[in-house]
From Swiss-Prot:
PANTHER family: STERILE ALPHA MOTIF DOMAIN CONTAINING PROTEIN 10, STERILE ALPHA MOTIF DOMAIN-CONTAINING PROTEIN 12
Biological process according to GO: cell surface receptor protein tyrosine kinase signaling pathway
SUPFAM superfamilies, sorted: SAM/Pointed domain (SSF47769)
Protein name as annotated: Sterile alpha motif domain-containing protein 12
Cellular component GO terms held in the UniProt record: cytoplasmic side of plasma membrane
Family matches, as CDD domains: SAM_aveugle-like
InterPro entries: Aveugle-like_SAM_dom, SAM, SAM/pointed_sf, SAM_domain-containing_protein
Gene3D superfamilies cross-referenced by the UniProt entry: Transcription Factor, Ets-1
Length: 201
């Protein structure tokens, strides 16, 4: 099973944040100033003209890959969101699962807390089906942790209602200082390591 990895660079002053400003050049760790694409003989420099379509497209793609889409955290998923997830990740048994999940009011928070015994009580009798669901839930937990880690490295973390007082009790955005980011980053790295180890059965 493949698990996506995330690399975060730490320096003595704090975390290296992804740069979004135009004109800033990033150096890839482990390589000199020249990256593999520059060393490639077929590489052609695009003239540094403002408005060049190829350059603008490349910058847009770089910005997209460096930022995290602020989607709704799994803990805030409704039953409908969980059913969409089930349909995507368990299409063969979707009808059976969706009915059982609706009857037991499984939201995102409950999905993250599912166990083998809970699934058995919900009427999913076959052990291999329960294990498949739990495997998908573990992968979801890893993706959620990676997402949170990426948000932390960007200095922004979206918190669910009730965790932090906000205007009209909506989702709040917490901006973390460098020391807070480093401490939370280490905590998330430990959690991801634990989850990855538990996936490798």
């Amino acid at each position: 099973m493949a698990v996506e990895a995330l690399h975060c660079g730490l320096n003595p002053r704090g975390i290296d944040h992804p740069a979004h400003a135009e004109g800033i050049k990033l150096q890839i760790e482990g390589e000199g100033v020249e990256s593999q694409s520059i060393k490639n003989k077929n590489f052609q420099k695009v003239p540094d003209q403002k408005g060049t379509p190829k350059r603008l497209q490349a910058e847009a793609e770089t910005a997209k890959s460096a930022t995290v889409k602020l989607s709704k955290p799994v803990a805030l998923w409704t039953q409908q969101d969980v059913c969409k997830w089930l349909k995507k990740h368990c299409p063969n048994q979707y009808q059976i699962y969706s009915e059982s999940f609706k009857q037991h009011d499984i939201t995102g928070r409950a999905l993250l807390r599912l166990t083998d015994k809970k699934l058995e009580r919900m009427g999913i009798a076959q052990e291999n089906l329960r294990q498949h669901i739990l495997q998908q839930v573990l992968q979801l937990k890893v993706r959620e942790e990676v997402r949170n880690l990426q948000l932390l490295t960007q200095g922004t973390l979206l918190l669910p209602d009730g965790w932090m007082e906000g205007e009209m009790r909506r989702k709040s955005t917490l901006l973390l200082g460098q020391t807070g980011v480093r401490e939370n980053l280490l905590l998330f790295l430990r959690r991801i390591s634990f989850i990855e180890n538990s996936i490798q059965i």
